[in-house]
Amino acid sequence: MXNIRKSHPLIKIINSSFIDLPAPSNISAWWNFGSLLGICLALQILTGLFLAMHYTSDTATAFSSVTHICRDVNYGWILRYLHANGASMFFICLYLHVGRGLYYGSYLFKETWNMGVILLFAVMATAFMGYVLPWGQMSFWGATVITNLLSAVPYIGTDLVEWIWGGFSVDKATLTRFFAFHFVLPFIISALVMVHLLFLHETGSNNPTGIPSDMDMIPFHPYYTIKDILGLFLMILALLSLVLFSPDMLGDPDNYTPANPLSTPPHIKPEWYFLFAXAILRSIPNKLGGVLALVLSILILIIIPLLHTSKQRSMTFRPLSQCLFWLLTADLLTLTWIGGQPVEHPYVIIGQLASILYFMIIIVIMPLASLTENYLLKW
């Protein structure tokens, strides 16, 4: 009798994806983040679903409904903070996952990589719209500032902004549609994740050496299932520590003040995971230029496979490229710090230099360093 795991039309898909999947024998803990992202997505959909049962997307009651969830709904407070801090864990895992792809040359799986960039955009859009829903000061003004950037689009800009707002300012219509999109996007993301995995399983996983590992594969279960469970426990530990000990550490105190269109907060800034983009946006003293730089700071990931000039895939044996990779990491951390600072000297110039360096490292310095390494190895 055939094994149901290998014969059932539905179960055999799961089997070939998570159980009998051949995986390289030497993939490190940096390969854990894919599964962690899947768990983050499931957690966000689950907590979000229960929050949506009690939330009202109306400007008059949105803020009160969030307060009601935290005060009156059974375990509503933990749902709300798991959802808010779960987003932070999601982005930590996302950035580490992308960083892993850059370091080990995983971007040469072009379909998987491009799908990943689309996923990154979708998750960022979802997180932005979710931040608007509690209808606090930072929600309202963040929505106003970011949607207003679209007015920089030549000719159709103003019409575009008013179309997205559903009126002449961020108001009732905006909140309702943002809630609708915020609810539906995670399900679209789930479908895109399936496509991402489909493309990945066409080629199989990369590994730290960057050398094809077809001759040395092991089954995903039990080796990597147990390894992923360890990663999961560590992530849950970090998330619960955050939720139970300092749930507001990563939030903005301004968001505990109900939205007021007549009073602008002194510093309008996004959540920490968008600060690097905010710093790049405001380092250019021109609206359209800033918006282009903002979009390109993420869209640049699409062209990274074209900028790969090294004869080696991974950075494991390339010290020069390694130094530049960690310089890029430090540069992004600098941009994140600058994004949270007021627009004054010396933060402005630091932000501008860090922004220039960010694009220079990716477009010019790294490809040149790779060519240099090829030359030094007489390739």
Curated annotation (Swiss-Prot):
Cofactor: binding comment: Binds 2 heme b groups non-covalently.
GO cellular component assignments: mitochondrial inner membrane; respiratory chain complex III
Single GO BP term: mitochondrial electron transport, ubiquinol to cytochrome c
Residues that coordinate or bind heme b b562: 83, 182
Molecular-function annotations in GO: metal ion binding; ubiquinol-cytochrome-c reductase activity
Intrachain S-S bonds: none
Quaternary structure note: The cytochrome bc1 complex contains 11 subunits: 3 respiratory subunits (MT-CYB, CYC1 and UQCRFS1), 2 core proteins (UQCRC1 and UQCRC2) and 6 low-molecular weight proteins (UQCRH/QCR6, UQCRB/QCR7, UQCRQ/QCR8, UQCR10/QCR9, UQCR11/QCR10 and a cleavage product of UQCRFS1). This cytochrome bc1 complex then forms a dimer.
Job of this protein: Component of the ubiquinol-cytochrome c reductase complex (complex III or cytochrome b-c1 complex) that is part of the mitochondrial respiratory chain. The b-c1 complex mediates electron transfer from ubiquinol to cytochrome c. Contributes to the generation of a proton gradient across the mitochondrial membrane that is then used for ATP synthesis.
Protein name as catalogued: Cytochrome b
Organism: Pipistrellus abramus
